[in-house]
Amino acid sequence: NFAGLYLNTNKERMEVKGYTLKKDSADPYVTALLNSGKHKMKAHEILSGRTALYTNIGFNSPVTFVKELHNKQLYDSYQSSRKKIEGLFGISLEENFLSWMSGEFAITQSEPGLLGHDPELILAIRAKSIKDARKNMEFIEKKIKRRTPVKIKTANYKDFEINYVEMKGFFRLFFGKLFDKFEKPYYTYVDDYVVFSNKAASLLSFVEDYEQKNLLKNNPGFENALSYLKSSSTIFLYT
């Protein structure tokens, strides 16, 4: 194991740059990420100004990421679940779910908004085309509703459509523990992103911040930190 780091510090900031060799025993999801390229970060343009913790994960494409899961046990488990889901609902996970994703995933934890008392979790997935994303999500909803008793609900808040699909472990099927906190997601569409959360109130607070321009991109501290970094990344963490 080896790591080489360069440390630079002054009164205003501390900067660490360098390289490290990946362990052979590294988590298979980390290995898959490192082998799947990177993606331009833009999610901060829609994220709430209340964001306390922000992780941006980027790769060339979700399809590439899944194919990079060389861990046989994980990949076999994915393939088994995939066949069951596709057979049960009559959908293609690759064509109807993974294909519209551009490769940028933003996970945030925010301070409680006006409509709740608990920290809010948000997952924002950037779409290649939001029109295509909406079309495929509606197709998946239609198939699920036709073939199962799974609850599907839709409500409108201002000009935003809030959707809910009661399917536990939906994200874990595709991306394992990366998104295991989002079990039965509510979701809506904001700009080029499909935005998910475990609670409807979290999405409503998110929409309020977006409408009021209370955005992370306008935070001076975040803006300053981002100015020192490249616009494309595999893993980015801000707190």
Per-range role (PLM):
Residues 1-69, 104, 177-186, 199, ...:
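Leucine-rich, highly hydrophobic segment in Treponema pallidum outer-membrane-associated proteins
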Residues 31-35, 80-83, 87, 99, ...:
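Polar/charged alpha-helical tracts
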Residues 36, 72-75, 88-91, 95, ...:
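Surface-exposed polar/charged interaction patches
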Residues 38, 42, 53, 72, ...:
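Generic amphipathic alpha-helical segments used as scaffolds and interaction surfaces in large
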Residues 40-41, 62, 76, 92-96, ...:
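Short secondary-structure junctions and interdomain/linker hinges
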Residues 41-46, 78-83, 147-151, 220-223:
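Glycine-rich loops and low-complexity Gly/Arg-rich segments
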Residues 50-90, 145:
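Predominantly extracellular/luminal regions of secreted and cell-surface proteins
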Residues 55, 95-225:
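Single conserved position on a long alpha-helix in the C-terminal lobe of the eukaryotic protein kinase
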